[in-house]
Amino acid sequence: MTTQPSVQSQIEGLLPAGGHVEVVAIVWATVDLDRVIAEMGLPAEALPDDKLLGAAVRLVRRPGADSIALLEPTTEGRLAATLAKSGEGPAGHYVRATDGLSSVIARATATGIGMKRANDGPFGPSALVLGGPAVGPHLIIVDRSAGTIDR
């Protein structure tokens, strides 16, 4: 996992001084999971659906690079809107804040930054940062204690 400055700057108001995030996976929007998995030529692991974005999720681990979470819409939600506007491709990030999801949500509440929380998701408990366009890019913060994060 790497820390990406652009992701870091998106959530600076949600982190304590000196806090940072680690990219768990790049969100990749697609209308056909099987086709994209075949094109990548790497194994893909089925993960629980992402209820925040309305999508089925497959995780592709790339040697020496960030993992990619391939998402295909299962509802007429945010991911479907992303695909309608921008087509297939990168659509955001799943990140882990070093001080945990609860701390991030508390700071968001205190500063008026909207978040939508899910108790389960592809990487465990998570929250979608609101305020940007519904079509993305999407930023989902996952809890540091989630058992599936070491991917």
Question: What are the residue ranges of the model-derived segments?
Answer:
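Vicinal oxygen chelate
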Residues: 1-21, 25, 47-51, 56-72, ...
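A short, acidic/glycine-rich surface segment
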Residues: 8-10, 77-81
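Short glycine-enriched loop/turn motifs at secondary-structure junctions
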Residues: 19-22, 84-90
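Amphipathic alpha-helical segments
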Residues: 29-46, 101-111
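Short Gly/Pro-enriched loop/turn and capping motifs at secondary-structure junctions
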Residues: 75-77, 99-101
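Beta-strand-rich interaction surfaces with strong enrichment in secreted/lumenal proteins
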Residues: 81-83, 117
